[in-house]
A protein has these predicted regions:
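Short, polar/charged alpha-helical segment
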Residues: 2-18, 127-128
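Extracytoplasmic "Venus flytrap"
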Residues: 1-8, 27-29, 115-122
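Adenylate-forming
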Residues: 32-35, 56-61, 124
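Hinge/capping helix and adjacent helix->loop/strand transition within the periplasmic-binding protein
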Residues: 13, 40-45, 61-128
Length: 128
């Protein structure tokens, strides 16, 4: 969702500032690749990051080789969106609600696979 939110915010900022905001979506590693790029960019006043709790709180703890320090390299400006996490499965999955899902995972954890945006991403944390 960071890319979508960034584009919506950039559109409003462009109108307000009277200049184009360019969005460069750097995907991969739960947002840590883009965060690392912004952390090492020249401090020009024009480079901003649409990050997440995953890339700035969870990933640095779970991934020892991130190329930035969230507290040292960034300053929070504001919250732009609140995106709830959802868990979905194939229609033929043997659980129809969260209670059944939790019971199934407890009994069959080795059979359950998850898809997420990277270690430490909000979708990864929601699946834990």
């Amino acid at each position: 969702p960071s890319d979508v939110v960034a584009r919506i915010v950039a559109d409003g900022m462009s109108k307000h500032l009277g200049q184009t905001m360019v969005i460069e979506n750097v995907g991969g590693a739960g947002g840590t690749l883009g965060s690392g790029r912004v952390a090492s960019a020249e401090a020009d006043g024009y480079t901003l990051l649409a990050g997440s709790m995953g890339s700035h709180v969870a990933a640095p703890v779970l991934t020892p080789n991130v190329r930035y320090d969230s507290e040292r390299d960034f300053i929070p400006i504001g919250i732009t969106a609140d995106a709830p996490a959802v868990i979905v499965a194939r229609k033929d999955f043997p659980a129809n609600n969260m209670k059944e899902f939790v019971a199934y995972v407890k009994a069959n954890g080795d059979k359950v696979k998850q898809a997420h945006g990277g270690v430490g991403s909000s979708s990864h944390m929601a699946c834990l």
